[in-house]
Regions:
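Alpha-helical transmembrane bundles and membrane-interface segments of multipass inner-membrane proteins
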Residues: 1-171
Length: 171
């Protein structure tokens, strides 16, 4: 868990101190880029709005970490649930990484107060970029991009939980 938080924070601090907001470098062709963006809200840039919305989101994240921690302790003592301990621990590490951004980055980087920091995102994988045909039933002639979200190490830590859930369910 500590490794995920450390890698997450080191990568964010590097991007924050070596890139300009919006700066992008191509790592592998056009499909893997480092693109510096900051997220004011949560997944996919969804915001609760205003000063109190940001505070609510930050306190929700902190409460979620407490609940997830308690959940991990309970799962650790149940042999049927132990296979979920590692994935949930990675989720916990990811949540802690994003909480650090939300609580401290506003003050550390001098752009806002405590609990109003923005989450640093940098990994961008636009695997498919095309224009939809004019006769396409929805969004005819519009630009289409898959995979559009920009994310960070903390965000990526959720993937093992999804994989473990699929493996157990036999999907």
């Amino acid at each position: 868990m500590l490794a995920v938080v450390l890698i997450d924070q080191l990568s964010k601090l590097y991007i924050k101190t070596h890139f300009f907001l919006g700066e992008e470098i191509h790592v592998m062709g056009n499909w893997f880029r480092l693109h510096f963006t900051e997220n004011y809200g949560m997944a996919f840039g969804i915001e609760l709005g205003g000063e109190y919305g940001k505070l609510l989101l930050t306190f929700f994240r902190i409460a979620a970490v407490g609940v997830i921690g308690w959940f991990i302790v309970k799962m650790s003592s149940d042999s049927l649930q132990q296979k979920f301990v590692l994935p949930w621990t990675l989720i916990l590490a990811g949540a802690i990484g994003n909480i650090i951004d939300s609580v401290f980055y506003g003050v550390w980087f001098g752009y806002d107060t405590w609990f109003h920091g923005r989450v640093v995102d940098m990994f961008y994988f636009p695997l498919i970029q095309t224009t939809l045909p004019e006769n396409f039933p929805i969004w005819p002639g519009e630009e289409f991009e898959f995979f559009r979200p920009v994310f960070n190490v903390a965000d990526a830590a959720i993937v093992p939980l999804l994989e473990a859930t699929e493996a157990v369910a036999g999907v």
